[in-house]
């Protein structure tokens, strides 16, 4: 049996140096046209530190929540300009993406059960592509292997986010949308990009407080998973479409956005440690195979969506990519992506959270299917 080890704490001065290096890398990335450079730079720097120093770095909730609000607002802005008929047009691509995701997640869970002899509970929660932190919490409730679920979920998230800049550049070149190409690869004026509008800042504060108040008031009747993503998007669309709130208030800019991207990058890269990778070294080939299958199936689904419904290949891939929802939405915003990305990704998160809520029944079903047959009398 593997002995659990407590993650080492990170000295404050280490965090300062890592942040400084990450900011410099991000500013350089912006100059050369790397999309969502703050996510990529912070993921790379903090990820390397977490692995080689064997120190886990996880942003606290009080820091993660504002970042989630900022990114949710960024991605809700395009939805406010959509007519109802256009939203209905997203139904078929969304359905196709969800079906492919569920099939691949099911096969991945089956593979972990059969090949690595993981329990059904651990396998299901480790492979559901959506809401990594929620799956880790569920693993404790279902007595699954929380360490394995954490490793698999955040390894998938790290790989997906780390490969996004390459896929954005590659698929932009293959696409036919000049806007997407310029958005994905255009160089930025670093100084001008630091300008932060007071409207966007106020919008983030109001949105965050509104979601917080709503969850507190309704807690006795029901709870909403990922509220600072789902409710922020819902409330902002209602505010603009029905209440006439100017769009500037749901469009954060400048330092506010860069800080949110940096926090998401730390979350994606700082969770994996050398100790965690060493503990499950034998399972890594299967885990990486599962991640590769997820990315490959997303590319296949993206090709079908692009050909059948006329979207760019980049938008279709960002809509179907499995996991790292905040990072994916950030890259979609940076590349001038179609609202399809937000619609499909949000629906994927909702679908995975619903499946996660029924995880005990799913685990029970898989357990019965793989239970040893009773001995013959």
Predicted regions and their residues:
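Structural signature of multi-pass alpha-helical membrane transport proteins
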Residues: 2-63, 70-83, 104, 196-276, ...
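Short alpha-helical transmembrane interface motifs in multi-pass membrane proteins
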Residues: 10, 89-94, 117-121, 199, ...
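Cytoplasmic-side transmembrane-helix entry/capping segments in multi-pass membrane proteins
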Residues: 59-72, 91-96, 117-128, 151-154, ...
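Membrane-interface helix termini and inter-helical loops of multi-pass transporters
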Residues: 81-89, 173-196, 244-252, 276-279, ...
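Membrane-embedded alpha-helical segments of transport systems
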Residues: 101, 130-135, 150-172, 325-327, ...
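Membrane-interface capping segments at transmembrane-helix boundaries
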Residues: 114, 277, 361-375
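Alpha-helical membrane segments and immediately flanking helix-loop junctions
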Residues: 115-155, 311-346
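Long hydrophobic alpha-helical segments that form multi-pass transmembrane helix bundles
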Residues: 157-210
């Amino acid at each position: 049996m593997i002995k659990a080890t407590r993650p080492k704490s990170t000295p404050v001065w280490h965090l300062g140096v890592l942040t400084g290096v990450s900011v410099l890398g991000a500013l350089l990335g912006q100059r050369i046209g790397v999309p969502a450079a703050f996510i990529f730079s912070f993921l790379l720097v903090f990820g390397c530190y977490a692995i080689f120093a064997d120190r886990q770095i996880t942003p606290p909730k009080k820091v993660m929540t504002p970042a989630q609000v900022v990114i949710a607002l960024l991605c809700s802005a395009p939805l406010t300009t959509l007519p109802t008929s256009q939203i209905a047009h997203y139904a078929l691509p969304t359905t196709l993406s969800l079906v492919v995701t569920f099939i691949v997640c099911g096969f991945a869970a089956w593979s972990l059960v059969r090949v690595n002899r993981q329990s059904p509970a651990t396998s299901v929660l480790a492979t559901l592509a959506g809401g990594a932190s929620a799956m880790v919490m569920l693993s404790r409730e279902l007595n699954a292997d929380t360490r394995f679920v954490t490793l698999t979920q955040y390894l998938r998230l790290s790989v997906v986010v780390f490969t996004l800049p390459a896929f954005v550049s590659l698929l932009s070149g293959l696409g036919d949308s000049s806007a997407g190409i310029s958005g994905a690869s255009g160089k930025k004026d670093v100084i001008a990009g630091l300008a932060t509008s007071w409207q966007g800042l106020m919008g983030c504060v109001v949105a965050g407080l509104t979601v917080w108040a709503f969850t507190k008031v309704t807690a006795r009747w029901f709870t909403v998973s990922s509220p600072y993503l789902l409710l922020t998007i819902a409330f902002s669309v209602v505010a603009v479409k029905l209440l006439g709130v100017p769009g500037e208030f749901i469009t954060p800019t400048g330092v506010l956005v860069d800080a949110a991207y940096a926090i998401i990058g730390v979350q994606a890269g700082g969770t994996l440690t050398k100790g965690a990778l060493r503990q499950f070294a034998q399972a890594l080939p299967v885990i990486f195979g599962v991640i590769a299958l997820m990315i490959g199936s997303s590319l296949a689904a993206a090709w079908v969506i692009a050909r059948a419904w006329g979207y760019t290949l980049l938008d279709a891939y960002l809509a179907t990519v499995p996991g790292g929802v905040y990072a994916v939405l950030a890259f979609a915003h940076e590349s001038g992506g179609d609202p399809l990305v937000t619609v499909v990704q949000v629906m994927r998160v909702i679908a995975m959270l619903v499946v996660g809520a029924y995880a005990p029944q799913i685990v029970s079903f898989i357990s019965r299917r793989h239970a040893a047959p009773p001995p013959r009398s």
